[in-house]
């Protein structure tokens, strides 16, 4: 089977994607698959470089990769690929839209507003949300251009910076508490990990530095675990996720869980959360890649 690891891309998360792709290449069973690295440098590359593949193993992140566009191209070309489909990928990449779906389904998520320009900033609504707030690109990832803002005077500059990366910026309530991630594979919850950041919040550096943050299997009290599990699986379902995705949450100091976001192409670097969760379940990195390929192919057949 000819498997192409699709990596690189044109988003602000290109370097993370390249790291994920290299890590997958180093761990995939090369006796089982005929493997090639396919580095995307511009949009047209996807049309030219995937020809002849039996399977596309996606290691892309951010725009034109995690947002459904590449998935749609591959659907048109009838090439099976890993993970969620075009609709789910697009929906989860758009934080505003995904939060609207969660709210409509009575799934708890932090309060938020969005703006598309400096002129649209509604300081009264931000006051209602309450400082501090997070300001970040609506379609961003890996905490690129994400700012924790404590006062009104700093909102404008943070929004301006976010608008450099996306046409819409989300301003979201900060919830103090324990950050956890719920890896879901084929509709099943894998071991939950707690993220213990060494900084004020889990930013880009904390996510990808070798010693940036601790990722620890967490034991939750049963009633809380049951609630977290139900929320995570329902989120996976209502956002139309397939094969695998990571549902990030925060548990407030009062013990109330909130959905933060859903990652439809979770990182696959040496420090990434999903491979660590699989490992704690006794699934090696190489075996996990096998499972992703097998389950994704079964999805395509259905």
From Swiss-Prot:
Compartment(s): Cytoplasm
Domain ATP-grasp: 99-294
GO BP terms: cell wall organization; peptidoglycan biosynthetic process; regulation of cell shape
Transcription regulation in keyword set: no
Essential cofactor(s): Mg(2+); Mn(2+)
Pfam annotation, one family: Dala_Dala_lig_C
Reactions listed under catalytic activity: 2 D-alanine + ATP = D-alanyl-D-alanine + ADP + phosphate + H(+)
Ligand binding (Mg(2+) 2): 261, 263
Disulfide bond entries: none
Cofactor note: Binds 2 magnesium or manganese ions per subunit.
EC number(s) reported in the record: 6.3.2.4
Keywords (A to Z) from UniProt: ATP-binding, Cell shape, Cell wall biogenesis/degradation, Cytoplasm, Ligase, Magnesium, Manganese, Metal-binding, Nucleotide-binding, Peptidoglycan synthesis
SUPFAM superfamilies attached to this UniProt entry: Glutathione synthetase ATP-binding domain-like (SSF56059), PreATP-grasp domain (SSF52440)
Pathway assignment: Cell wall biogenesis; peptidoglycan biosynthesis
Positions bound to ATP: 126-181
Family: Belongs to the D-alanine--D-alanine ligase family.
PANTHER family according to UniProt: D-ALANINE--D-ALANINE LIGASE, D-ALANINE--D-ALANINE LIGASE B
Function: Cell wall formation.
Protein name, UniProt field: D-alanine--D-alanine ligase B
Lineage: Bacteria, Bacillati, Bacillota, Clostridia, Eubacteriales
């Amino acid at each position: 089977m000819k498997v192409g690891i699709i990596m690189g891309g044109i988003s602000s998360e290109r370097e993370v994607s390249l790291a994920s792709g290299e890590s997958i290449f180093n761990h995939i069973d090369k006796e089982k698959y005929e493997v090639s690295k396919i580095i995307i440098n511009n949009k047209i590359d996807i049309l030219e470089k995937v020809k002849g593949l039996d399977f596309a193993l996606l290691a892309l992140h951010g725009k034109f990769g995690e947002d459904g566009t590449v998935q749609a191209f591959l659907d048109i070309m009838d090439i099976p690929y890993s993970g969620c489909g075009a609709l789910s990928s697009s929906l989860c990449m758009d934080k505003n839209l995904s939060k609207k779906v969660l709210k409509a389904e009575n799934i708890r998520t932090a309060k938020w507003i969005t703006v598309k320009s400096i002129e649209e900033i509604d300081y009264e609504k931000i006051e209602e949300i309450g400082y501090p707030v997070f300001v970040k690109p609506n379609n961003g990832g890996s905490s690129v251009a994400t700012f924790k803002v404590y006062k009104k005077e700093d909102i404008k500059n943070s929004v301006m910076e976010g608008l450099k990366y996306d046409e819409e910026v989300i301003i979201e309530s900060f919830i103090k508490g324990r950050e956890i991630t719920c890896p879901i594979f084929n509709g099943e919850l894998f071991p939950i990990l707690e993220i213990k950041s060494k900084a004020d919040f889990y930013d880009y550096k904390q996510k990808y530095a070798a010693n940036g943050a601790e990722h620890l299997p967490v034991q939750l009290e049963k009633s809380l675990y049951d609630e977290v599990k139900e929320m995570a699986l329902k989120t996976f379902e209502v956002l139309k996720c397939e094969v695998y995705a990571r549902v990030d949450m925060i548990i407030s100091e009062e013990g109330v869980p909130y959905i933060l976001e859903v990652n439809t192409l979770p990182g696959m670097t040496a420090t990434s959360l999903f491979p660590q969760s699989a490992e704690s379940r006794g699934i090696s990195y190489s075996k996990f890649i096998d499972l992703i390929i097998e389950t994704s192919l079964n999805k395509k057949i259905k």
